């Protein structure tokens, strides 16, 4: 929120990813909004708790709503906050199903992403996915001398948490790239002289994930 609005939490209203709601006495996510349904998700999501405009919103104003604004991220808060209040779509990976999901706040879910979900989403490929070190195991000098067996991590062994594990692995960035390429190929973004915005968020590890 700070990056896309240029403001501090005291102004943009996003004080954390989650906080305690004194009205409901329950934790609340920064992009929760029960007024909007989800696409390919049961989460109710919107940027309505964001109190200031983003540079995506300002681009929409400057182009009289002619600019296209899309956001793709591993997590819903990153996707929605970067798309802003007036974006055309924000998409993130469903950690339970492996499908790319969105929110009805931004209007109709795009046909090309529905097609992607039915043909290429990670749930079709999770069994074959595995994470390996980039270099030969012997090049990692900080490992014990006896560590000569190559390390491989398969997400399928997690069963109930396989997509959560995928989202917090380096391979999620490959998935972000795949769906971004599909968006660039099949949507109208970048196909005229009007400046558009594609906000892409990658995972690099953080305290909460």
Where are these regions (language model features)?
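N-terminal cofactor/phosphate-binding cores enriched in small/glycine residues
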Residues: 1-6
């Amino acid at each position: 929120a700070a990056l896309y609005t240029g403001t501090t939490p005291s102004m943009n209203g996003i004080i954390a990813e989650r906080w305690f709601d004194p009205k409901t006495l329950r934790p609340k996510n920064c992009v929760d909004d029960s007024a909007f349904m989800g696409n390919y998700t049961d989460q109710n999501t919107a940027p309505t708790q964001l109190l200031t405009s983003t540079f995506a919103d300002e681009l929409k104003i400057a182009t009289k709503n002619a600019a296209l604004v899309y956001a793709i991220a591993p997590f819903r808060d990153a996707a929605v906050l970067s798309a802003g209040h007036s974006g055309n779509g924000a998409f993130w990976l469903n950690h339970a199903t492996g499908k790319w999901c969105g929110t009805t706040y931004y209007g109709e879910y795009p046909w090309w992403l529905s097609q992607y979900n039915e043909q290429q989403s990670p749930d079709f490929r999770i069994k074959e996915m595995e994470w390996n070190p980039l270099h030969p195991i012997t090049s990692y000098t900080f490992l014990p001398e006896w560590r000569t067996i190559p390390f491989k991590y398969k997400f399928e062994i997690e069963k109930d948490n396989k997509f959560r594990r995928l989202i917090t692995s380096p391979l999620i960035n490959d998935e972000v790239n795949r769906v971004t390429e599909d968006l660039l190929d099949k949507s109208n973004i970048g196909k005229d002289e009007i400046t558009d915005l594609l906000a892409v968020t990658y995972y690099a590890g953080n305290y909460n994930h």
